[in-house]
């Protein structure tokens, strides 16, 4: 199967725009279709890879919800919060936890040109207290 030069150039241009300095860390998403929707959003925004903390070590996505995004966004599975945070910080990422507390600040007040990781909590409970204590900044 051959690919038309115009289509090849378009695919190449999209892949060249992927942002390796932007990622997300998702903590214990309960429903696979929600993780799939996050991957689809990452793909649309040009995020190169996403990170997931799963205590059960089972990462499931729904193809119908992800619409093929799982092929283009690398999904890194972390066994626990500590290894996830260590890995991202060792790669130079600053972690912004999406939670509303007394220390949260408006997300629009930051320069995101450096390595940035948005940390998202589970649908029912949001971020765990353990993870909130490890992020660099809470944002809303």
Regions flagged by a language model, labelled:
Residues 1-140:
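Post-transcriptional modification and biogenesis factors for structured RNAs
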């Amino acid at each position: 199967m051959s690919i038309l030069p115009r289509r090849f150039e378009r695919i190449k241009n999209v892949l060249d725009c992927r942002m390796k300095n932007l990622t997300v860390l998702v903590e214990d998403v309960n429903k696979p279709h929600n993780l799939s929707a996050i991957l689809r959003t990452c793909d649309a925004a040009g995020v190169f890879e996403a990170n997931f903390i799963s205590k059960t070590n089972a990462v499931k996505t729904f193809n119908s919800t992800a619409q093929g995004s799982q092929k283009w966004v690398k999904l890194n599975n972390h066994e626990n919060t500590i290894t996830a945070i260590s890995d991202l910080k060792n790669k130079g990422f600053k972690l912004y936890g999406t939670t509303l507390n007394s220390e949260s600040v408006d997300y629009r007040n930051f320069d995101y040109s450096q390595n940035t990781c948005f940390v998202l909590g589970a649908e029912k409970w949001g971020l765990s207290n353990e993870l909130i204590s490890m992020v660099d900044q809470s944002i809303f």
